[in-house]
Swiss-Prot record:
Residue numbers bearing the Phosphotyrosine modification: 4
This protein's name: Glutathione S-transferase P
Residue ranges of domain GST C-terminal in the record: 83-204
Residue positions, PTM N6-succinyllysine: 103, 116
Species whose genome carries this gene: Capra hircus (Goat)
Coiled-coil zones: none
Function summary: Conjugation of reduced glutathione to a wide number of exogenous and endogenous hydrophobic electrophiles. Involved in the formation of glutathione conjugates of both prostaglandin A2 (PGA2) and prostaglandin J2 (PGJ2). Participates in the formation of novel hepoxilin regioisomers. Negatively regulates CDK5 activity via p25/p35 translocation to prevent neurodegeneration.
Length: 210
């Protein structure tokens, strides 16, 4: 029986990184899908700590905030670096992912038509730090930190994949990031999840953009 439950809208959004993590780590979970009409009625929203989703259940532990959920899974499943130094770097990477994700969400939900061209033009400067980090770790042939996968890898992979949908050539000038995405995409359990109807048929965002 699954001990994890994801309560979220019928989109990838802020939950796909945790789904990728759980699938790749051979963990089972349940989905409680919240229709927007139901959400707008109010009671569920009022019951959520910050008035927002996702909500995550791990047994009797209830968590909100997607990055807190990822960090919890990182600690629980041994995906937080091998020592405190690596854990600090994993946190740094994840904060960098969050910075770019917030820019992406703002574009998608508030300024897509008018802002997409400028966003894509500025994208290389936001991707470059991740290419640099890869180059500093085993020549870019491993993970974003150390020699074992971390929760930040799943979050970064999700971020890069959705940007490849937004701008298909965005990684062309970043050979290490391109190889990194291909390498993680090919992990057997993750590859199976990414090919599954659950992933393929779930839109990235909730407003029809991607």
């Amino acid at each position: 029986m699954a001990s994890y439950t994801i309560v979220y809208f019928p989109v990838q959004g802020r939950c796909e990184a945790m789904r990728m993590l759980l699938a790749d780590q051979d963990q089972s979970w349940k989905e409680e899908v919240v229709a927007m009409q139901s959400w707008l009625q109010g009671p569920l929203k009022a019951s959520c700590l910050y008035g927002q989703l996702p909500k995550f259940q791990d047994g009797d532990l209830t968590l909100y905030q997607s990055n807190a959920i990822l960090r919890h899974l990182g600690r629980t499943l041994g995906l937080y670096g091998k020592d405190q130094r690596e854990a600090a770097l994993v946190d740094m990477v994840n904060d960098g992912v969050e910075d770019l994700r917030c820019k992406y969400v703002s574009l998608i939900y508030t300024n897509y038509q008018a802002g997409k061209e400028d966003y894509v033009k500025a994208l290389p400067q936001h991707l470059k730090p991740f290419e640099t980090l890869l180059s500093q770790n085993k020549g870019g042939q491993a993970f974003i930190v150390g020699d074992q996968i971390s929760f930040a890898d799943y979050n970064l992979l999700d971020l890069l994949r959705i940007h490849q949908v937004l701008a298909p050539s965005c990684l062309d000038s970043f050979p290490l990031l391109s190889a990194y995405v291909a390498r993680l995409n090919s992990r057997p359990k993750l590859k199976a999840f990414l090919a599954s109807p659950e992933h393929v048929n779930r839109p990235i965002n909730g407003n029809g953009k991607q």
